[in-house]
Amino acid sequence: MKTKAFRLFIALLVIQTFLFAQSEGMVFIKGSRYIPLYGRDSTVVEVKDFEIDVYPITNAEYENFVKKYPKWQKSKVIKLFADTSYLSNWKNDLELKASEKPNSPITYISWFAAKDYCECQGKRLPTVDEWEYVAMADETTKDARKKPSYNKQILAWYEAPRFNENTIGEHQKNAWDVHDLHGLVWEWTLDFNSVLITGESRKDVDKDSNLFCGSAAVNATDLMNYAAFMRYAIRGSLKAKYSMKNLGFRCAKDINLK
């Protein structure tokens, strides 16, 4: 009896320590090995434990950032690090236009700016593998990629106009307790330009032909591949200084074991 009570005490202590250690506004992601889609020759990718923001970074959060770090204000940013669209939806260096909502995701943001924002918070941008790992969850399942309902919902979001005007948190959280990975804006990743899609890639399923030909019925795997193809295609078209209406970001963080 004493042994069971001691084990229970230790388990509760570990859980309590973990909860207190989890960074504010972030959730812990238990790493694992998984097979990503598109663009890699290796079969399995290993993702280590990490934390990720629950929500994308908002206009209000980025407004506070540029007040603290003036070099990222729209009139002061070095053009090498941001194109002419950078913060083009802002009224001036420190104010949003009246049409913009403080709690909407920040967009018109370059990779350089997003990366520096995260680093100034003691964080970093998530890698492609980390982002895809968390994003393959639906509301109940951490790998929902083979569920037709999951893939059809994502494709419906992709086919509709981007919703950068909407506020964060309107979509139900996924099984990791993360919101808005799909259906709000595209998101920068740390290594966005590390993946190229070619017909020679082992996982470029059927040389992409089934994704675009109507000769056969579209099954769950086709939808899964097509959704992934669209994400990788967007990433492959970007350059680090680009700023787009429908491109935002969130931050991640390594787990530091002491």
Please name every model-derived segment.
Residues 22-84, 109-112, 183:
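A short glycine-rich, aromatic-capped structural motif
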Residues 44-48, 164, 233-234:
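Flexible glycine/proline-enriched surface loops and loop-helix/loop-strand junctions
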Residues 245-258:
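Short, structured beta-strand segments at or near domain termini in extracellular proteins/domains
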